[in-house]
Amino acid sequence: MKKYYSLICALLLAQGAMAIDYDQLKKSSKINVASKIELSKLQTQEEKTVVQSKATGSRLKALQKQMDNRTVRAIVRMTPGSDASTLAAEGITITSVVNHFAIATIRLSQLEKLAERNDVESISFGKRRKRLLLNKAHKSTGVDKIHLGTGLTQPYTGKGVAIGVIDDGFDPNHIMFQDAEGKSRFKMICQSEEENKPLTYLTTPAEIAAFQTDDQNESHATHVSGIAAGNCQNSTFQLQGVAPEADLLMGPIPYYDSDYEMFDKMVSWCRENGNKRLVLNMSYGANAGSHDTTDPEVAFMDEMIKKYDIVACIAAGNEADLDIVQRHTFTGGSDETMKAAFYSDLDGDDEMDVTEIYDYITVTQPEKQIEIDVVVFNTNTGTAKNTWKFVNSTHPDGREYPYSNTNFHGKVSVQSEDIGNGMKGYLLAITDISLLNSNCSLGYVIRGKEGQTVTSYLESTSVFDTEVPGCGNHITHDGTINSIACGTEPIIVGAYNTANSYKGADGNNYTFQDAFYGYKYGNKVGDITFFSSYGKLADGRELPHVCAPGLFIESSFNRYTDNYEEDVMKELTVGGNKYEFGQMSGTSMATPYMTGICALWLEADPTLNHTQIRDIAQQTAVLDAYCNTNNYYTKQNDGNQAGSGKVDAYAGLKYILDQKSSVLSPIADNKRFMIRSLSNNTFEAYTAGAVAMSAALYTMDGRLVSSASQSGNTIQVSAQGQHKGIYILRISDGKQSHVQKVVVK
């Protein structure tokens, strides 16, 4: 078929028809590797269409023109200082411009000319494989000290701030997101109705009320949104997220880079509705990427964050325990190789369940020619049954080819691109896998030159099979960090444990071992969670920045799926509607904690920029013994899995209010004062700007039972030894007094 199609294309090109020269396009250094993979798919689609049509003459030319007019939606990166909007003069439809980046709809026939422009640096339109990455957690992060506790003040709830959740599996009319009038607190629903097409937006209350869900198989987004900003206050059940009065906006996971146009819409909504600050939550990720700022998706996100001063929180990833990173520095040995095999049977049922494999390989000193062979290994002996040479002096930038033999049926492609820090990247894609013999494993053999460091980032749809002889060397877990999280502007969030069990709706208690059988590390309360990804990047940065609660977190479930029934913790029926709440674990759950905390901090001081918010999170984080203890996998000189430590919402808020009061910035009286209950019936009060404070605790009939005074803006008073009940706490800073009912337990 391909030979016949190639003859047709050659004829059409010779006649001046509009046939696309795909092979020439894939050689362009301006089209990134994921887009080259997409071009191959478009080429295959065209081959089938043309051959099956049996068209000739004018009918064939018309069909070819139709193929050429197919469109892709891309991020176009131009040289800094260029006006990206000028692309419209070429007949290209522009939907978003961020400095020298544009999101554009481009006809295939326009790609070659666009790539030839001197002011165009890169074009990215490939589909990227991405995966979805409360009670006890509130106390550990200090959120309860800000707005929870019987009879205590609730000054900060995220009011006046918008939270944009980019995810999958939304139920925006769940009781967790209803206001006092029963209306959804979601103000915008952005959805992808057709792959690689412009997104659609719902913004009216009627449209949002009529919306059910974007995905009947998933509950992830509903759970994440509940952690960040949910608020269920039913008479029989209460569960509150971190920022329960923040406005909510929802958007789909951007499988195509161009889907990031939704950020523009969210920013516009914020500006048109009180100039609110925007905090974004991205609890999804991918590992097969360059892990640097040259990644088109990462670079565009950085520019968007800087332009609009968005606070963006991104999950670190859940792969710290997986064998998905291999790294080796070659010493120049004559037979030195870097070998790896891929698992194809992940669930151990002796049946192949991996139909596509994506692996991104970075290489230092790219002026030295590297060699990459794709291999079918004998899983028992580690010997090569088939070897195909994909990168060498003959094919320095890779190639693609379909294979069909007694061991393997599928398509193999290796594409290259120049990336940051003087490195080159290769994307290995093995797709359409329809046969792999039971005693065979796909993999690679890499040969490098002395001094070259090669790092392989495998997408976790598979993992390295370290049991194949000779293929278990050079595995590291430093680098499991989410590739999408490698920008310079977001806050990257890892996970730690605030619980090691949960109670199901069936009344049974489920432990760590029930959920994660066989794991004997990272399972204690306080531990950095065993799966929390981390990594030291080529530019020296270490991620994540901070950690937040991520194990057995309770939140809302999507009513339109039953895929999470085993994780349900509570069922609630209101007005004939059944609502479910349950647990999930992951850095996906830790990230909305950080997102909600950012909303609280921005409510306290909306003038803080995104960099200051991140700095405060790191400066006030708790770096305890658990954070300083390497996890099971970390090795000497690895990045720090805990980052700067465990986020402390209360300490961060106090820091912000202290800074405001020190420069005489106005703080409303009802926002200056906070009180929290500590252990052993001790109460702590804080007043922004105070230089000295006094506290007195009275019984309800006015009898003084405890008092204290001290300099500074924080004071503690003890109720130890007092009977259980309600007491009156009076706090004074010499200028004003606060009277509050408190409960002694």
Outline where the language-model segments fall.
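Autoinhibitory N-terminal propeptides
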Residues: 5, 18-154, 161-163, 175, ...
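Subtilisin-like serine protease catalytic core
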Residues: 20-21, 149-259, 274-277, 289, ...
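C-terminal subdomain of the subtilisin-like protease fold in secreted/lumenal serine endopeptidases
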Residues: 61-64, 277-281, 310, 314, ...
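Active-site core segment of subtilase-fold serine proteases
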Residues: 154-156, 169-222, 226, 378-462, ...
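Catalytic-core environment of secreted peptidases
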Residues: 193-206, 373-392, 405-407, 412, ...
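Hydrolase catalytic cores
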Residues: 225-228, 249-255, 309, 358-380, ...
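Short acidic, glycine-rich surface-loop motifs adjacent to enzyme active sites
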Residues: 246, 267-292, 315-316, 445-450, ...
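C-terminal outer-membrane/trafficking sorting elements
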Residues: 666-745
